[in-house]
Amino acid sequence: YTISGCLLNEALQSKEEFTPEMQKEIDDWFDQQPDFLPQTDSLSQRTNVVVILCESLESWVLERKVEGKELTPHINQLLKDSTTLYAPHVLTQVKGGRSIDCQLLLNAGMLPIANGCYAVLYPNNNFYTLTKAVTEGNERNATLLTVDKEVTWNQGMVAKAFGIGTIFSKDSWVLDEKVGSRKKLGDVSFMKQSVEKIKKNVVRMSPNNNYLQFVTYSGHNPFKLPEALQQIHFKGDYPERMRDYMTMAHYTDKAIGIIVDYLKSRPDYENTLVVIT
């Protein structure tokens, strides 16, 4: 249980030999699965992609009312849209890299390694990513917006490997809403400032082949939102952690509403695919 012991154990575990038997087990599993084909009749071609990675946002708060109040009214409204594809029955597949593993899953379509973190061990890999496909190799058209430092989970190097040319990180924002134990920028202010940067063309959003990726923070454990930022309250005797999570989810939902409403106001919205996960 020492630091050196943990590192040694991780190194030993990560060098497990991949055997022909393991390959056969994988192949047999795929052979037993039904083919899933794209629903081409319900999908129209979009050349702009906006991805919103929400920290610890779980599906149980969606489409749910507590004491007559919607926990996520803005997302709920999106779910009613006939063009929305909703996949609620998805289990977490991240490993030791947590949120940075999510970026690997979504952007590169790859599962994270079982031990350790790919972002630290393999940041210089040549990844075939959604970003590169959307921007057709033009990194100027791909932007990452995060309230973290670039060194957090080695985000800076990973973004470059994924084909993201521009990063707006911690020092790019005015810290006017402090949220969480680490007092980072709250989601609502993050989205408000992001919209202003897009309007002023500080954040580049070209009409075509554009990729924007937002990474939120406020939903990070322990889900403590300052009272001044709380816009939903409950009278019932709920477990403290549950109450805190519902309050935080409502706050993050408001932030999502801000950026989505802005995107809808743009003339290129019909050409934009918005992914919230």
Roles of regions detected by a PLM:
Residues 1-13, 77:
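Transmembrane and membrane-interface helices of multi-pass
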Residues 19-20:
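Fold-level signal for large, globular catalytic cores of enzyme and receptor domains
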Residues 24-277:
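Solvent-exposed soluble domains appended to multi-pass membrane proteins
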